[in-house]
A protein has these predicted regions:
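Short, structured secondary-structure elements
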Residues: 1-132, 138-146, 150, 155-200, ...
């Protein structure tokens, strides 16, 4: 349910997916969650997908965007996996060593353009001032995705930990979950660090992370009488199941 919303697995506006593509995309996600694929590997499979959106269902991630431009891919990927709403203006918050302009090459080659064309001879300047020259035979998309999903990139793990916390409690340790900024600090930095360390140490195992959250003292504590309850919107699937249970009509 949550993943379907995040990955826009639907054929209605604003997605541009055919119904058959949606079914294949949903099945791809279902199989990964059923097999408990590590989060980093699932994201790599998603972002490195190419080819037919029926034979390679994860390609629907890219096809679902209204604006299929390098900038839009960039902003949406960083919003989803790094929690950054405005990476174009604040690229330093997303990349520790890579600048925005220096990561456009691979996005210009996803599915739509010639992946074998020669890269432009631009300079790549790292955060420490080191200047690198693009290598012609480098797969820039793979380089970016491997950096994004690596355990060294803690933000990638932190954002997933925070999403799961939000799904359980209705409010993230960083709230909103998609708004990671210098002036939007975690409400409990130690809890976020502890869960992130656990998530990385267990090879991005999402089931173990969810289990740890559900067994936490926070989740199992009684609510304070004067405490504030955080209302949560029911997902569409839960509403449908509730109506089916009441009416006895499941088809």
């Amino acid at each position: 349910m949550h993943w379907g919303d995040i990955l826009r697995i639907k054929s209605e506006f604003p997605s541009n997916l055919w119904p058959n593509g949606v079914q294949a995309y949903n099945r791809w996600l279902y199989e990964h969650l059923l097999q408990n694929t590590p989060y980093d590997l699932m994201v790599r499979d998603l972002l490195l997908s190419e080819g037919s959106n029926f034979r390679s269902p994860a390609v629907n991630f890219y096809r679902g965007f209204q604006q299929r431009t390098p900038e839009n891919f960039y902003q949406n990927i960083n919003l989803l996996f790094l929690g950054d709403r405005n990476c174009e203006d604040n690229g330093h918050l997303c990349f520790s060593q890579v600048k925005f302009k220096s990561t456009k090459e691979w996005k210009e080659e996803i599915i739509y353009l010639d992946v074998h064309k020669e890269l432009p001879s631009e300079r790549i300047v790292l955060g420490d001032g080191t200047v690198l020259k693009p290598v012609a035979d480098t797969d820039w998309r793979r380089e970016y995705v491997m950096w994004l999903t690596s355990s060294a990139n803690r933000r990638f793990a932190e954002v997933m930990v925070n999403r799961m916390w939000f799904w359980v409690f209705g409010k993230g340790i960083v709230d909103e979950p998609d708004d990671w900024r210098e002036d939007n600090k975690p409400s409990d930095p130690r809890q976020l660090k502890s869960l992130t360390d656990y998530f990385i140490a267990n090879d991005f195992n999402m089931r173990l992370l969810m289990k740890k959250i559900l067994l936490s003292e926070e989740f199992n504590s009684e609510m304070a009488p004067a405490g504030k309850y955080v209302p949560q919107r029911l997902p569409a699937e839960v509403i449908v199941d509730a109506l089916a249970t009441v009416t006895g009509i499941w088809n």
